[in-house]
Amino acid sequence: LMQVFRQHNEDYEKQVEAGMKAKGTLLKYKTVYKHLQEFLSIRYRVKDIALKELTPAFISDFEMFLRTDKHCCTNTVWLYVCPLRTMVFIAINNEWLTRDPFREYEIKKEETVRSFLTKEEIRLLMEGRLKNAKQELYRDLYLFCAFTGLSFADMRNLTEENIHTYFDE
């Protein structure tokens, strides 16, 4: 399992470097890889397991590890189980695995209600004094995204070349 995951992450990283895949997704894969390493070490006292040992019980145990040891909520668990499912698909497609352990496993994402800042809360955020320059930078970046509608992921990839003070060029 971990060998498949490691190779997947190496290939994915090359695609990120080529601009074909998102860096944020790679970070998620790397995080899940680390959690799986820790899970295997703690629960099974091994560094890797054979693909044929992937069972619905293994997946449920990993889910419980994420909930209890890592204190993940349902939607984070769902987000972290998806890359494991991707590794299973890779194994099935390469005929390294003949059955899908996820066939008997189900986790549903919970519906979340997003809250929004009021104009007054935004004003307080804009005018508030923060403890240090780093907090002020994060506040300013948040406000930039809030006022422009730019996503955090897009803002993270923003470069000086993307910013124009006028559009006559």
Locate the predicted segments by residue:
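Short, aromatic/basic-rich helix-turn unit that serves as a nucleic-acid recognition element
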Residues: M2-V32
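Structural motif corresponding to the C-terminal cap of alpha-helices
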Residues: Y12, V16, Q37-Y44, L66-H71, ...
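N-terminal DNA-binding recognition helix of tyrosine site-specific recombinases/integrases
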Residues: G24-T25, T31-I42, I49, A57, ...
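Short, intrinsically disordered, charge-balanced linker/junction segments flanking boundaries
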Residues: L1, I163-E169
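A short, basic/aromatic helix-end/turn motif that makes direct DNA contacts
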Residues: N157-I163
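Basic, Lys/Arg- and aromatic-enriched nucleic-acid-binding interface segment
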Residues: T74, W78-C82, L97-F152, R156
